Design a protein with these regions (language model features):
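ATP/Mg2+-dependent ligation/transfer catalytic cores
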Residues: 3-254, 258, 283-298
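Short, internal active-site loops enriched in acidic
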Residues: 59, 204-206, 261-265, 317-321
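Loop-rich catalytic cores of soluble enzymes, especially ATP-dependent carboxylate-amine ligases
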Residues: 83, 213, 220-221, 228, ...
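Long, charged, glycine-rich C-terminal linkers/tails
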Residues: 252-261, 312-318
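A short mid-domain helix/strand-loop element embedded in enzyme catalytic domains
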Residues: 256, 263-275
Length: 358
């Protein structure tokens, strides 16, 4: 009995050590706040950041994760933004009919317009007692002088839509519902992107039947339920980790799928199979919104793994049971020269119409 109590206390202590945000660590470098010298000086004050990883996204959403020693980044800083510091084998990722085996070189061009995140390995401590960190810098993939990755497609798509909208509004032809829009005062077209991330968590060694999950869903057993045990602890830590990286989490809650977890003789939550959701603040930079989503998935996976839980972001991981929807909220607005912002998707009469003509 005493041994069991000690084991339980030890587990609790370890969990407490895991979930504390370390104020001595650097979790992200905000875009636009530091120049070259500022970034280099900041990194030198955090020697536990030992690696740099350029994060490129292929056409299937896979992200690269290599380990470049931090000394090379500090020495060749400008080369990382010129696309001459790091290359990868494009034939090994999903770039269909673009980077082939005999023409596979893809250059990685670092992106300074978005936040850079630091990913820490808590299983590997540096000499100062802090976990070893990797600076993750989002990048574009360049092949034969052309950008070919998902991030560049998103950037070019937004630029294309903005240009077409400017041309439409400045054409002189009346746009229904936009007659009062001060076209001559428009300085820029901007986008707002907000995502909602749903996911399933489960105990890896346990398997629940579709029938059990389906019955629970029909009976609405998980609707408005509280999170308990290691699921609650992992969710709370994930929120703290995301907030520490400047994502401004708005909500974490249970979704409709799942079953009630069991409790063992020591009070530990076991046999977990639940559906959850995490939401954070939208971004005025579509690339930043996409990067936030990717980084959030990585952090959530790592945090829940520490508590013995497996995470799936698949749209339909279990046939016949509620899937994980990916709600993406898109807004388009006109930024005026006087600093005012006008929502281009809102109709002139909110009671008569749902959306504007645009």
């Amino acid at each position: 009995m005493q041994t069991a109590i000690k084991d339980q206390q030890s587990t609790i202590i370890k969990q407490e050590e895991f979930k504390m945000i370390n104020n001595d660590l650097l979790y992200y470098i905000p875009s636009g706040e530091f120049g070259k010298e500022g970034v280099l000086g900041l990194l030198k004050t955090h020697p536990e950041i030992r690696f740099v990883s350029l994060v490129g996204i292929d056409l299937a959403g896979n992200d690269t994760d290599e380990k470049v020693p931090i000394e090379l980044f500090l020495k060749n800083y400008d080369d990382f933004f010129a696309g001459t510091a790091v290359q990868t084998d494009g034939s090994s990722v999903v770039l269909m009919n673009i980077a082939t085996l005999n023409d596979a070189r893809v250059d990685m061009v670092a992106d300074a317009s978005v936040n850079w995140y630091i990913d820490y390995n808590e299983d590997n401590l540096y000499s100062n007692g802090r976990p070893v960190g990797t600076l993750r810098i989002p990048c574009f993939l360049l092949h034969n002088g052309k950008f070919i990755d998902s991030r560049s497609i998103l950037k070019e798509s937004c630029a294309f839509v903005a240009e077409k909208l400017k041309g439409l509004l400045a054409s002189g032809k009346p746009v229904k519902g936009m007659e009062d829009l001060p076209v001559d005062e428009i300085e820029d077209i901007k986008f707002t992107i907000g995502t909602e991330l749903e996911f399933w968590v489960k105990t890896p060694s346990e398997t629940e039947t579709v029938q059990h999950l389906s019955i629970s869903q029909r009976l609405q057993e998980q609707y408005w339920q509280r999170m308990r045990g290691n699921v609650r602890t992992a969710m709370e830590e994930a929120i703290e980790e995301l907030d520490a990286r400047g994502m401004h989490v708005e909500m974490g809650h249970k979704e409709v799928g799942g079953i009630k977890p069991k409790v063992d003789d020591l009070g530990h939550t076991v046999d977990v199979c639940e559906q959850l959701e995490l939401d954070w603040l939208f971004s005025m930079n579509p690339l930043q919104a996409a990067d936030n989503e990717l980084e959030a998935r990585i952090i959530i996976r790592e945090v829940f793994r520490k508590y013995g839980l497996d995470v799936s972001f698949q749209a339909k991981p279990i046939i016949g049971v509620a899937g994980s929807g990916e709600h993406t909220h898109v807004g388009i607005c006109a930024s005026l020269k006087n600093g005012k912002t006008i929502n281009l998707l809102a109709p002139s009469d909110m009671k008569a119409d749902f959306l504007s003509t645009i």
